[in-house]
Amino acid sequence: MRIVVALGGNALLRRGEPMTADNQRENVRIAAEQIAKVAPGNELVIAHGNGPQVGLLALQGAAYDKVSPYPLDVLGAETEGMIGYMIEQEMGNLLPFEVPFATILTQVEVDGKDPAFQNPTKPIGPVYSREEAERLAAEKGWSIAPDGDKFRRVVPSPRPKRIFEIRPVKWLLEKGTIVICAGGGGIPTMYDEAGKKLSGVEAVIDKDLCSSLLAQELVADILIIATDVDAAYVDWGKPTQKAIAQAHPDELERLGFAAGSMGPKVQAAIEFARATGKDAVIGSLADIVAITEGKAGTRVSTRKAGIEYR
């Protein structure tokens, strides 16, 4: 079975946790313990978020004023290497030594006319109090938005159109390699058709939407969107909340989910299920084996109408 696992940012750094290398490695180790359970006998691709990490690099760059800050596409590439290295090493420590791994720097095409460039929505970096956020917005010209009871910097998040490195990813999978790619939604890139040239863009692509595109282009058998809850819920946080066990994309789309949290995950699952006729599942990383067996998570499928709740 060809599996694409999209790791949420919380799998790499928990909310409010200091962004140290040791903390990130420990979280990667915990995630690797779960993902390694589904590696034997399957073709495995791992995508991951990078919001906290790319924000931290931006802050570190801004602190050294003798060099102009690096653009977001370059910072995204840096995080792909850093996080991919940690995942490779921690997964490799759990699986037989001869199992090959590869991290692919992944350029992802976006449209320069995407309206997202005029409406920044993607949170990056650490969380701030209202006072801190307002001060930083004034000092640095950032766009700031609420994130729960805190605030974060937000940047443009255009839709992914095409993954340029999809052929090398396929070649590696066919040779039995576990591939880490499309980290942080990939490196946002524009393609000049006339000049046949690529150029980076100041943006961060949504990891879940890019993972959905990746799974579609790889013709994956299942897309697993791993998060810190066991399913997608209706009425989340209310006494009436209910976990969704299974849903047809059309029915799920009518419910509406928060744009900054579950919304992109649900949309990514819907797009994959519609495009391929295969299942996408939103659930907890701790349940990954049960998810592959159809026993856990919210399964988005075109094969059955309606919605079922737990």
Curated annotation (Swiss-Prot):
InterPro entries per UniProt: AceGlu_kinase-like_sf (IPR036393), Asp/Glu/Uridylate_kinase (IPR001048), Carb_kinase (IPR003964)
Source organism superkingdom: Bacteria
pH dependence (record): Optimum pH is 7.0.
Top-tier EC class: transferase
Assigned keywords, A-Z: Arginine metabolism, ATP-binding, Cytoplasm, Kinase, Nucleotide-binding, Transferase
One GO molecular-function entry: ATP binding
EC number: 2.7.2.2
GO cellular component, one term: cytosol
GO biological process, one term: arginine deiminase pathway
Pfam families in the record: AA_kinase
Main location: cytoplasm
CDD domains associated with the record: AAK_CK
UniProt family annotation: Belongs to the carbamate kinase family.
Description of how the protein assembles with itself and partners: Homodimer.
Function (record text): Kinase that plays an important role in arginine catabolism. Catalyzes the phosphorylation of ADP by carbamoyl phosphate. Shows weak activity with acetylphosphate.
Name of the featured protein: Carbamate kinase
Species of provenance: Pseudomonas aeruginosa (strain ATCC 15692 / DSM 22644 / CIP 104116 / JCM 14847 / LMG 12228 / 1C / PRS 101 / PAO1)
Lineage, highest ranks first: Bacteria, Pseudomonadati, Pseudomonadota, Gammaproteobacteria, Pseudomonadales
